[in-house]
A protein has these predicted regions:
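Beta-sheet entry/capping signal
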Residues: 14-18, 25-26, 92, 125, ...
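Generic beta-strand/beta-sheet core signal
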Residues: 20-22, 30, 35, 129, ...
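Short acidic (Asp/Glu) and glycine-rich catalytic loops that position anionic groups and cofactors
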Residues: 28, 41-48, 262-268
Length: 451
């Protein structure tokens, strides 16, 4: 399926790209997939975009508009919404969840530098997720962050797959070496910043062979926390992405990677294959124990073992940070936090915590703003008028109450929470579901009732 045309449509406060494809005339329009359009979200799944006359040119964010909005002087509708909803409240700014702030484009163009400088001047709480040693060890950037070290408004997650240089060069082609990335941790830890070893992704069959040295070197470099998530495989991938599966399989030690993931992944989660808890348990156990024994925070972005997160932030951000309390300003209105609380309550008191939709997702204006929900890409049969009125609260409520949805809490967390009733709003009530591993770990003396 080839892309036929891409049209940019400016409709304040959002920008929309309409994508038409050949053969069945699918469209990605106004934030939704229509007429059975299929997965044009990811670069790896877009072979038709490569060397194509229809390919969009890579452009940077408008740094001035973003800086103006962060500082309370937005120049457009989108900026005003973001300021009133997030920036004014100094909501944690996560930079690097989708695009690395330390990529080589930044080294060449320096657009991000101006934004980083503004974030420092505003004392704005910011979390960087990066592999970009060429940027974050560059004298220009090091000097910038040294300037703001006393106010401690920045935190740094450094992403690693393996500590073995040869293996890393095969899996993370063109990425700075593990040694250089450890040096990022050391440099910014020495400045006094909150630093996190980000095991992303933890690849079973690869990461465990160097995990001991990686943990020890990261600890020696000064980490405050570790966050982890396991490699997952998208069964809906394009032919180009599937070629990568063939290439990756022998590095992991399997013949057929899709078949391996299909066999060992819970079907309740649909086509995005995540290995089951039993496969992941020994790996999580090692990292969790390491954190507990060394006074580190533990975060889990994986749906399995998310309950073990010690602060309620899957990124392992602090929940108590006297150096700059602004770094604590991440939302508690998400299931990672509530699973953590349920685990803590169970292992401290023996009580089974219950979770209600109205308590997990409380009154926050961003849940009820239809403009913001336009950022959420979904497949829907809604007409355009209903889609324009759709909010995150409605989306979340549908997932919450639809036991057939892959995003339903019971399915997404693979039984870690189970429905136990219906409340006065006709929303399902879920309860924490203790699992056998918790008893085993507790008997071994592993602390589960702490933070």
């Amino acid at each position: 399926m080839k892309i036929k045309s891409i049209k940019k449509i400016t409709a304040e406060p959002t920008t929309v790209y309409n994508i038409e494809t050949e053969k069945n005339n699918n469209y990605f329009a106004n934030g939704i997939l229509v007429h059975n359009c299929f997965s044009y979200f990811f670069k790896a799944n877009n072979p038709s975009m490569k060397n194509s006359e229809t390919a969009m040119e890579l452009t940077s964010v408008d740094a001035k508009k973003l800086i103006d909005a962060l500082g309370g002087n937005p120049t457009n509708g989108r900026g005003r919404i973001m300021y009133e909803t997030f920036y004014k409240r100094k909501f944690l700014f996560h930079w690097g969840g989708l695009a690395d702030p330390g990529c080589n484009f930044e080294l060449k163009n320096g657009v991000g530098y101006e934004i980083m400088k503004a974030l420092g001047e505003l004392n704005y709480p910011t979390l960087f997720s990066t592999k970009g040693a060429n940027v974050f060890l560059h004298k220009k950037y090091v000097s910038l962050f040294e300037k703001y070290a006393e106010q401690n408004n920045f935190a740094f997650q450094v992403s690693m797959v393996t500590n073995d240089q040869e293996t890393a060069s095969k899996i993370e082609v063109g990425v700075p070496s593990p040694k250089k990335r450890i040096e990022i941790i050391r440099r910014y830890s020495e400045m006094g910043y909150w630093t996190i070893l980000r095991l992303r992704p933890y690849i079973v069959g690869v990461t465990e062979y160097s995990i001991d040295s990686l943990l020890e070197e990261a600890l020696d470099a000064g980490i405050n926390a570790i966050s982890m998530e396991f490699y997952a495989l998208d069964s809906r991938a394009s032919g180009e992405a599937k070629k990568r599966y063939v290439w990756l399989a022998p590095l992991i030690g399997v013949k057929d990677l899709p078949a391996y993931f299909h066999k060992l992944s819970p079907s309740e989660r649909g086509g995005y294959r995540r290995l089951n808890r039993l496969v992941k348990e020994p790996h999580v156990k090692k990292v969790y124990k390491f954190c507990i024994e060394n006074g580190l925070e533990f975060g889990c972005s994986d749906p399995d073992f998310k309950e073990l997160t010690t602060t309620g932030s899957c990124c392992a951000m602090p929940d108590h940070y006297p150096k700059n309390p602004l770094l604590e300003n991440w939302t508690r209105q998400q299931m990672t936090y509530h699973l953590k609380e349920a685990r803590r309550i169970y292992h401290s008191t023996g009580q089974i915590a219950k979770m209600r939709f109205c308590e997990v997702y409380k009154d926050e204006n961003y849940f009820d703003d239809p403009v913001l929900s336009g950022d959420h890409i979904i497949e829907t049969t809604l007409c355009a008028a209903d889609r324009q009125r759709l909010t995150y609260r409605k989306i979340l409520r549908n997932y919450w109450n639809n036991l057939r949805s892959y995003a339903n809490p019971r399915n997404y967390f693979h039984g870690k929470v189970i429905p136990c009733g219906v409340d006065e709003n006709q929303d399902l009530i879920y309860q924490y579901n203790p699992m056998p591993y918790e008893k085993r770990w507790a008997e071994e003396g592993i602390i589960l009732g702490g933070k």
